[in-house]
Amino acid sequence: MAFFSCFALASILQGPASPDQLRVMVWNVLRGGNSVQQGPEKALQVIRDAKPDVVLLQESYDIEGDRPKLGAWLAGELGWRHFQGESAHLCVLTPYDIDATFFHHEWHGVGAKLKDPLGRSFVAWSIWLDWRSFVGYELRDHPEMTDAELIEAETKRSGRVNQAEALLGHLKTEGHLNESLPVLLGGDFNCPSHLDWTKDTQRVFERRRALDLPVSQLVVDAGFEDTFRKIYPNPVQHPGITWSPMYRGSLAAEEGTPQSFERIDRLYVHKMNDNLASKLVPVSAHVLPVVWESDQIPAEERVFPSDHGAVVIDFKWISTDPMSK
């Protein structure tokens, strides 16, 4: 069993095995790494170990001291490129060429057109939505709430639905919803997916119901596909939890009250249209950290320096040109 576990972990941490693969990481790095001892250095090591081709960062804030924002500092350490623009915290980080950049809102969306070493281009967006009235906490604190009242956590008591609609509207205006290139949309949605709140998960998880949660439904209705659920369609067998590996309860070594564990960090790929010369197909997925650290370790001393897990998705480039087959 120990041998199998080590082998499985080594397989996950291997980077893309061929030029036809693309690895994308989505990660909210907790306040620019400032909340954990040597947080920026630990974040750098996580990225180096994961070997992504693209990192969609959230909370890329100024590093305490005389260093720049986290994304800029990581790019310098890795010898990569990055785009954060006027955003307070959103960043696209990559070794690839950045041919164009896109800006929606300083808090909610930045994007970039990237080109890999073989000349294949795609668009990647880093996004973040309102954290208030987290539906899992609403159900935890008010278990008597009706389904309609819970949905209002998304539609009325937070700005998530309005922000998602504005973001998707901007992508449509930019032409990214009928783009002739693959389009990725990833980040911290601060809400679960309707694909995870089902009758089966309601039976297994203490704080879930079978609900058509609106934010993820909006994204799917706009033509995007949830890459993690494409690989792992069963949310009971593969929950993909990203909130929270750091804060898990109310023990002395932690902060806060018992959590509502959810997959709030996600990566979507837009369903391909007929004009694409090649498309990106998700082929594997995992969430970091693979093993959660002991909850007896104070949060500021953790090796994994964030309260959010990182989503890592491997894609394969598939040619749609019949002449290339």
Residue positions per predicted region:
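A solvent-exposed, charged loop/short amphipathic helix patch at secondary-structure junctions
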Residues: 135-158, 200
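Short, solvent-exposed loop/turn segments at secondary-structure junctions
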Residues: 31-32, 62, 97-98, 129-132, ...
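Structured beta-strand-rich core segments of catalytic domains in phosphoester-bond hydrolases
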Residues: 36, 58-141
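Active-site beta-strand/loop signature of hydrolases that rely on acidic residues for catalysis
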Residues: 22-29, 43-67, 124-126, 153-200, ...
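Metal-dependent phosphoester-hydrolase catalytic domains
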Residues: 103-106, 113, 173-184, 191-325
